[in-house]
Amino acid sequence: MANVVVVGAQWGDEGKGKIVDWLSERADVIARFQGGHNAGHTLVIDGKVYKLSLLPSGIVRPGKLSVIGNGVVLDPWHLVQEIAKLRADGVEISPQSLMIAENAVLILPLHGELDRARESQNSVAKIGTTGRGIGPAYEDKVGRRAIRVADLADEATLALRVDRLMVHHDALRRGLGIEPVDREALLAQLREIAPQVLPYAKPVWKVMNEMRKAGKRILFEGAQGALLDIDFGTYPYVTSSNVIAGQAATGTGIGPGAIGFVLGIVKAYTTRVGEGPFPAELQDADGERLGERGREFGTVTGRKRRCGWFDAVLVRQTCATSGVSGIALTKLDVLDGFETLKICVGYELDGERLDHLPIAADQQARCTPIFEELEGWSESTAGARSWADLPGAAVKYVRRIEELIQCPVALLSTSPERDDTILVTDPFED
C-alpha cells in the first residue's frame, strides 16, 4: 500500500480538486503541505459544488482526517469563514476531522496590506500575486519573526511576537507610505480568533507518523503547480513556497520515505494566471476557444486564465523535479471539436533548439515554441470511462503526450464529475 502525493505539474488549475476527491474516498488522511488560501479548488459531488481554498479536499468526506501541515501559511480568519461556509452546506467539521499543525505560520492582516501595497507600487515588474499576504507571511517565517498557531495559546508570548514583528513591518510600511501597525488592535484580533483555531492545533508530525505506522493510507494534497515553485518555477513569477512533491515530507514532518507514489496532475492543454513567461500561449481564436470551453477563470480571484497548447517540454521538466510516477490527464473533453491540435515539443532561443526551459527570466521570455501538429477529433470524449469510449485520435493524442513527457498516464479525467475517470494505474497500490 502506497501513500500518494498529488502535485500540479503545470501552473496550477490543473483539476487537482476532483482527482484528490476521487482518491480521498480510499484514503484515511488527506494532508495539505504548502501554500495558503490563494489557490482554490472546485469539487463536484453528487451534483453539489464545493469551492475550497484552504481546507483539504477530504474535508467534505465523512470519516476522513483532514490535515493542514506546517508547510501551509494559515489565515485564521479565512479558516473560520471557510469552516462556517461548509457547515452551512451540511459538512460536519470538528477537531476529530480537522487537524492543524501547531507550528504552522499565521497570515495576519498586515501581510495582506503589505502584499497589496507592494504590488500596486511596483510599476516595473508586477508578479501578479493574489494580494492575500501569502508571500509576506513566508518572508516572516524565513526571517524567524512569524507568529505560529501555538503562539495563540499564550498571551505573553503572543505580545512578544507581535512586538518583534512590528519592528520589521513598521519600517517597511513607512517606506510604502502605510500607517504603522496598530499593536493593540492586532493583539485584540488575535485574542478573539484564538479560541476558534486552537481546538484544531496538534503536533501534526507526530500524528502523521503514528498514522503511517498504523498502516493508514495518506494522501498529500498540493496546491498550485510545479511551475510556480519558488526554486524550479518561472522565477520571479512564482509562489513563495516549494510546490514540488518533495515538499510533502517537509510540509508535514513525515519524512520522504513515506511517499510511495507521486501523481502529477496535467491539463490536456496549458493555462496560466497572472504575469510571467508562457511560451505556448495562444492569443488568437483557438486560445479564446480553449478559455471559453474550459471555463478558465480562477476559483479564488475570478481572474481570466491565459490559455495555450499542451507544452510537453515543461511537463517533462516538472515530472523530473517532482519524481512523478504517473500523471492524471484532465480536461481532455475541452479539446473536442478541434480539427488540428498542437503540442509544444521544444523551444528556439537565439537560433538554438532547447529541450528544456532555461532558468534565466530574460531567456524564458525569448523562448519561442516549436510545435508538432496532431489530428483532432469531432466526437465527444465527455464522460468517457474506458479507453473504448474515446475516439482513436484522442487515444493517439494521449499516447503522444506520454512519449514526449517520458511518463505514463495513470488516470484520465473526462469531465468535472468525479466518476468520469479512466483508471490505468491505481496510485494506492504498491
Curated annotation (Swiss-Prot):
Keyword Metal-binding in the entry? The reply is: yes
Is DNA damage given among the entry's keywords?
no
From what superkingdom does this record's organism come?
A: Bacteria
Q: Where does IMP bind?
A: 13-16, 38-41, 130, 144, 224, 239, 303
Which residues of the sequence carry a binding annotation for Mg(2+)? 13, 40
* UniProt GO cellular component terms: cytoplasm
Matching Pfam families? Adenylsucc_synt (PF00709)
Q: Where does this one sit in the cell?
A: Cytoplasm
Describe which pathway this protein belongs to, using the record's wording: Purine metabolism; AMP biosynthesis via de novo pathway; AMP from IMP: step 1/2
Q: What SMART domains does this protein map onto?
A: Adenylsucc_synt (SM00788)
> What protein name does the entry list?
Adenylosuccinate synthetase
Q: Which organism is it from?
A: Cereibacter sphaeroides (strain ATCC 17023 / DSM 158 / JCM 6121 / CCUG 31486 / LMG 2827 / NBRC 12203 / NCIMB 8253 / ATH 2.4.1.) (Rhodobacter sphaeroides)
Q: Which gene encodes it?
A: purA
